[in-house]
Amino acid sequence: MKKHLAIPLLAALCVVPAVESRAVEFKARGVWINMLEYGDGGSFIRKDRHGNSVTGWGRWGEDDFEAKTRVRLQLDAVASEALSGSIYFEIGASTWGRANRGGALGADGTNITKVKHAYLDWLIPGTDIRTRMGLQRIFLPDYASEASQVFDADVAGISVSVPFNETVGLTAFWARPFNDNWTDDGTGYAPDNYLDNVDIFGLVLPLTFDGLRLTPWAMLGMVGDNAFRAGNDYYGSGYGTDISPAWYALRNDKVGRHATYAYGTAFWAGLTGDITAVDPFRLAWSANYGSFDSGVQELNRSGWYASLLAEYKLDWGTPGIYGWYSSGDDGNPRNGSERLPSFDYNNESTSGFSGFGTLGTWSIGRDAVLGYTLAGTWGIGARIRDLSFMDKLSHTIRVNFYNGTNAPRMARYIKGELDAPGRTGFSYGNDFYNLNTNGGIYLTQKDYAAEFGLMSSYQLYDNLRLLVEANYIALWLDQSSTVWGGFHKNGTYTPANSLEDAWNVNVSFIYKF
């Protein structure tokens, strides 16, 4: 029977007209990381204001010791230099033994695999204009710290890059970070998915000269009234904490109804550059300004940031010094925030200034202990990177000093001592250790920190690296009654937190192909 069927099938194939096709080349790349780490003091709290001891690492529900695994796999389907498609998966980070992180017995967690990127890459026919469409990484440049203080995200959007010549280029993008996430919770604010989109538009103009790079950029955003809302709290969903004031007070007659019922406007602009004409000396800088105007002064935020780096490359390493300054809150919760607003920070972004205080680890180790950005701080630092006296072994050493730029009076609102008469206060935290971006700390002008870090890398094979990181941050928080200390309110005394320093050591095995 099979032979009888095969004869007509072969005959049919013979009469099908030939179709021209081009082979698609599939390219795979990826990174495997297995890591062991041990540390303490992640929140800088030994005992909280209620006398409760903080156990474990102090953040993210982690123990002092954790073991983790993360895999990233990217598959590129390349038809030609002008056309390709890419899918980029991330599995983990899985915490060994933790069920909701996919690491418990059976390793059958269902929430640890995600699509990080999925985009189409193509050249407009007859030109060198490259267009990328879909889920992709879009980021703003920073040649000094190597990590944007404003926007670096995996996001859905379209980016277009135009190389005018060897000196001038242009990248334009539109991205939609949020849309259709609002659900009417019975308060009658608005129907589901109404006025809840966030759209951003950006321009980056890289200028490359002999020994000099200059890149001005600008980004404009429109934020729907319900994009970040939960109930009567404009920022209550948690999505907008990066552009929200740390603590704000709305007039009582504004609470319980729409504060704006319109689109808010966000704007950022910056200039970054570096000079390498006097090799081996390099000078790099970055300056950013940003603002968000919701239509209600109390909800607004605007600020700026600037940094400078000088380094000198030698045979045995590259020593450098650097500094930064970022504006801080003025102590008045009725006029919004004076810190630089931002949108997102990517876990592929690695700061050259800090390996522990901000986004700085090369692996999946603990970092961003002080915050994902440097908003509301100033500081100076020194480092030696690529320090090497032995083949395949290199080190990076850092020392940083931090001081807050926020008014000390803000601490009294945040910790619950002060209220704003005739107003209702809102916040996404209630103490110094959970008021900065994504759980970082909030430093006032009377608070200081010092960071000491060592990172060592040994190349076991061409594609396998052993990475060891050891970091320590000492915190000097003003525990007087006028800042973060204990206080009396309504006949009750609330004591100060008992503090400790933060430290962490991790060992990572990184396979990259």
Predicted regions: what is each one?
Residues R229, Y234, S327-S351, M410-G422:
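A surface-exposed, glycine/aromatic-enriched loop/edge motif typical of exported proteins
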Residues K2-K3, P8-G134, I158-V168, A172, ...:
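Beta-barrel outer-membrane channel/assembly domains of diderm bacteria
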Residues S354-I364:
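Amphipathic alpha-helical coiled-coil scaffold segments and their short linker/junction regions
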Residues R130-W217, M222-G224:
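Internal, well-ordered domain-core segments that constitute the primary functional module
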Residues E298-N346, L387:
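Long, well-ordered mid-to-C-terminal structural blocks that present hydrophobic/aromatic surfaces
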Residues R176-A190, L214, M219-Y235, N252, ...:
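Outer-membrane beta-barrel translocator/channel fold
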Residues N52, Y235-G256:
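Intrinsically disordered, low-complexity Ser/Thr- and acidic-rich flexible linkers and loops
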Residues T95-G97, L140-D142, D180-N181, D329-G331, ...:
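Short catalytic/ligand-binding loop motif for oxyanion handling, primarily in non-cytosolic enzymes
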